[in-house]
Regions:
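Broad phosphate/nucleotide-binding scaffolds in NTP-utilizing and phosphate-metabolizing enzymes
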Residues: 1-105, 109-157
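ATP-dependent phospho-/nucleotidyl transfer catalytic cores
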Residues: 104, 134-192
Length: 192
C-alpha cells in the first residue's frame, strides 16, 4: 500500500527512454510496484528448475518475483521488467515472497557495479517501497526492486521441460529465444 520511489537509476531509465520528469509522477511508483498494471501487462512468475546445494531440484521458479511485461524501445531493443520482492507466487514454497530494504539496496548496487565492470547482469531500474513491514530476524522495512534484462529466461527454464520430457514446450521456448534473441539462427539447419 502507498508505494513510493526510493531510488531511480538514470542510466537504466535512459535505456527504456523514460524521461526524468516521469519519476516524480505518483503513477511511476504505482506501476513499478505492481500496484497498477502497465497497459497490456499480464504479470507472470516464471517456472524453472536447477541445482541447489549440490542437488537437482525439479521445480523451482520465481518465488518472490513477477514479470510485469516487456518494453520494446524505439530502437528495437527488448527489455523484460521483473519486480523482485512482489509477494507470494505459485512458486514461493515456504517464503513470504517479500524482500527487505537492505537486501534490495545490496542487489541494486551490486548489479550496477557488475554492469560497470563489464559483467553481463540484470540492470536495476528502481527501488520502490511502501508501508509494509517484513519479518525476518526482526521487523524490517519492505522494498521491491524493478530489474530489467533482455530476457529472464535462464538455463533452468529449459531444464524443467527437458527433465519432465515435455519436448513440445522445450521446442516452443527454444523457438521463442531464437526468434527474439538470436534471429540470425531462424531457419538455420543447426538452430538448436
Amino acid at each position: 500500500p502507498n508505494p513510493y520511489l526510493v531510488s531511480v537509476n538514470p542510466a537504466a531509465a535512459e535505456l527504456l527512454h523514460i524521461d526524468h520528469t516521469e519519476w516524480t509522477r505518483p503513477e511511476f511508483a504505482e506501476y513499478f510496484s505492481g500496484a497498477k498494471l502497465l497497459p497490456g501487462s499480464d504479470p507472470i512468475a516464471m517456472l524453472y528448475s536447477g541445482h541447489q546445494f549440490g542437488h537437482y531440484v525439479p521445480q523451482l521458479g520465481d518465488g518472490r518475483a513477477i514479470m510485469l511485461g516487456e518494453v520494446r524501445t524505439n530502437n528495437g531493443e527488448r527489455w523484460e521488467l521483473q519486480l523482485k520482492g512482489a509477494g507470494l507466487t505459485r512458486f514461493s514454497r515456504d517464503g513470504d515472497g517479500r524482500a527487505v530494504m537492505r537486501s534490495t539496496i545490496r542487489e541494486y548496487l551490486c548489479g550496477e557495479a557488475m554492469h560497470g565492470l563489464g559483467i553481463p547482469t540484470t540492470r536495476s531500474l528502481c527501488i520502490v517501497a511502501g508501508e509494509e513491514v517484513v519479518w525476518r530476524e526482526t521487523p524490517e522495512p519492505g522494498a521491491m526492486l524493478l530489474r530489467m534484462a533482455p530476457t529472464h529466461v535462464r538455463f533452468g527454464s529449459f531444464e524443467v521441460f527437458y527433465y519432465r520430457r515435455q519436448h513440445e514446450y522445450l521446442k516452443t521456448l527454444a523457438d521463442y529465444v531464437i526468434q527474439y534473441h538470436y534471429p540470425h539462427l531462424v531457419g538455420s539447419e543447426n538452430a538448436y
